[in-house]
Amino acid sequence: MAIIGSSYTLPDAPIILANNLLIGQPATATSAAGGFPASAVTNPLTYERWAPATGGSSAVTIDLPGKFFDTIAIAAHTLGTNGVTFTIAGFSGLLGWVDLITQTPTTDEPFVLCFGSSRIFSKLRITINKQAEIGVVYAGLRLNMPLSIYGGHTPDTLGRTVEYTTAESVTGNFLGRTVERAGYEASYSFKYLGAAWYRQNFDKFARDAITNPFFIAWYPSKYPLEVVYGWTDRTIVPNNSGLKDYLDVNFTVKAVKHG
């Protein structure tokens, strides 16, 4: 899918969505197939998913904790494969249900919606017009990196990592190949981040990334389709750059491929 802005111009610098407000929040659905509960959308796992029991229009509704958010994201879904049109709506006691966006994706890759200002609702609802699976839903305050990335970075969705087994005959003929695991991997390097900015903003993400995945788009304005839902394989730790009051940080993102 993509990262898009609603009354918001996407920047050149990376956007990260972590610190999900929806983790562990109550969730209900108009219906749920066996083994596909509504509660699946409020944990960060990609293999647990909600799916309605029948076709036609269905919805999953998630309680919000009464905190501001400016970004919503969806991952681990089959909306593109199933040709689904979905609508995200928010509920408040003053306005009732307010539609935020309607989309018809063509792939199963992550979707990220960035608002130009913070919102607050008591509930979030995702309505789909036909049967599909949704595994991950995030809402929170995005982290806008102050520095852009240009040279030396492998775009996330081009950094394919594939583990496979190749079958060959005794005479060396190619007999086939079995893909055992496929995903993405990309390394991020940021230099000269202000120490105060790091402690106030980036460190919240670094702490959350110890236990939870996150959404990241490396160049939103130019490559809005290149967004992934991934995790780090080690703790994110900064280094003092030695120049005035700056910190450098490096980390690697590993992501599952859904599209």
PLM region descriptions:
Residues 85-89:
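Beta-strand signatures of extracellular beta-sandwich domains
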